[in-house]
């Protein structure tokens, strides 16, 4: 299928995707129904932490602290047997001088290689972008290739694992990360090339953010984040539900 000129459009504070449908709204019932008995690992920066916050809030698990000093967050939804973990990626540039306890952070590759082996119902979201604008291109490529190598090892043990890449998005020019949007846009293309053929779920939020009725910022408002997570659910729910049906028919 040809890639459309735009990924979708906004109407009444809702993003309508032209590449992913039907949509699964972000709410407690949908999260419990789709992601039951699942371990969700969200790795990345504070923009990925916003996804964690949106999901936990939808589940009624409270709004976690969302500031620059939170590097590890965990929540459990007992009714659906759903475990959520956010892990900040280490060794990246940060706009402020802060102390980081290295025991609370993990490389994406280590998160993948340390996945529980008693179940294949694991989802890993990774999104290395905002803090990597200062990196040499070769070094950033090596970082991605390390993640790819870990995915290949993990999928040999369990082919049903699901891996999700959350793309960069445009941000305001006055952001603490002094890089042009073209750098982050090129990261999107590089990720598609590095992970080609792995069946990776690519949640592309570039056009959604660029076309939103709110001002562009590194940390977009809750309405945008909720629509981003809705797109994530629209990918995950059909895949996980189809596997549930296979289990019930065996």
For the regions a protein language model found, what residue spans apply to each?
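A compositional signature for long Ser/Thr(±Pro)-rich, low-complexity
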Residues: 1-250
């Amino acid at each position: 299928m040809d890639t459309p000129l735009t990924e979708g459009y906004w109407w009444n504070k809702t993003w309508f995707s032209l590449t992913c449908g039907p949509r699964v709204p972000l709410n407690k019932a949908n999260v419990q129904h789709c992601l039951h008995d699942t371990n969700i690992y969200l790795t990345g920066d504070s923009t990925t932490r916003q996804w964690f916050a949106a999901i936990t809030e939808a589940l009624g698990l409270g709004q976690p602290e969302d500031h620059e000093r939170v590097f590890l967050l965990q929540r459990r939804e007992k009714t659906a047997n759903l475990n959520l973990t956010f892990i900040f990626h280490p060794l990246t540039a940060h706009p402020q001088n802060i102390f980081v306890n290295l025991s609370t952070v993990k490389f994406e590759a280590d998160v993948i290689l340390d996945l529980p082996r008693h179940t294949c119902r694991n989802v890993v979201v990774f999104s290395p972008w905002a803090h990597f604008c200062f990196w040499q291109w070769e070094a950033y490529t090596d970082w991605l290739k390390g993640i790819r190598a870990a995915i290949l090892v993990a999928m040999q043990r369990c082919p049903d694992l699901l891996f999700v890449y959350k793309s960069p998005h445009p941000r305001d020019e006055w952001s603490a990360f002094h890089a042009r949007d073209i750098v982050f846009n090129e990261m999107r293309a590089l990720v598609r090339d590095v992970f080609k053929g792995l069946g990776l779920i690519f949640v592309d939020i570039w056009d959604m953010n660029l076309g939103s009725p709110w001002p562009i910022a590194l940390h977009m408002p809750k309405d945008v984040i909720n629509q981003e997570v809705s797109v994530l659910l629209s990918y995950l729910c059909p895949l996980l539900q189809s596997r549930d049906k296979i289990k019930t028919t065996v």
